[in-house]
C-alpha cells in the first residue's frame, strides 16, 4: 500500500472523503464545505514562487464563507495538509489534516499562511465504476440520486440512495446481487430494482 496509507491520519482522511462524497456540511467558525462527488480523482502540482519546490495535490471540495463573499477550492496535498485556492495564483494553508479542518479549524485560519506560486500538471484520473449516477425514477416521483459511498469491505459495497428527504441503504456484493435494501427503488448498472 505504501507509506501514505500506513499513517493513521491518512487513513482517517481517506475514510472521511469516501464517506462524505457529495455532501454539504457546516464548518466550525462559520461557512460550509461541499465534498465533491469525484473527490480525489483529479491531481495537480503547485510550484511555489522563486523555488523548485512542488506539492502534488488532489481536489477534495469547495468551501465558502458565511456571507458567500469568498469561495475556496479545497485541496489535499501529498504532505497531508489541507489547502484552499481562492484564485489561481496562491494557496491558503487551512489545516494539518481533513479531520482537523472539518471538526476544529474550518476556514477561520485561511489568511494566516498564503503561498504564492503557479499550478501545472493537471491530470484527471478516471473515476471508479459507479461513482455518481443520476437517473429519473418512475412517473410522478422526484428525480433521485444514487451515490457510491464506497464503504468497501472484503465482499460488499454499500450504496446510498437518496429520495427527497429520506435515504435508503442497500448492500450489494461484487456480483451486483442485493443483500438487503429499503422500500424504494435502487438503481445500479443497467438494472433498476424495486
Swiss-Prot record:
Organism annotation: Gallid herpesvirus 2 (strain Chicken/Md5/ATCC VR-987)
What's the name of the protein?
Answer: Uncharacterized gene 71 protein
InterPro entries from the UniProt entry: DUF1314
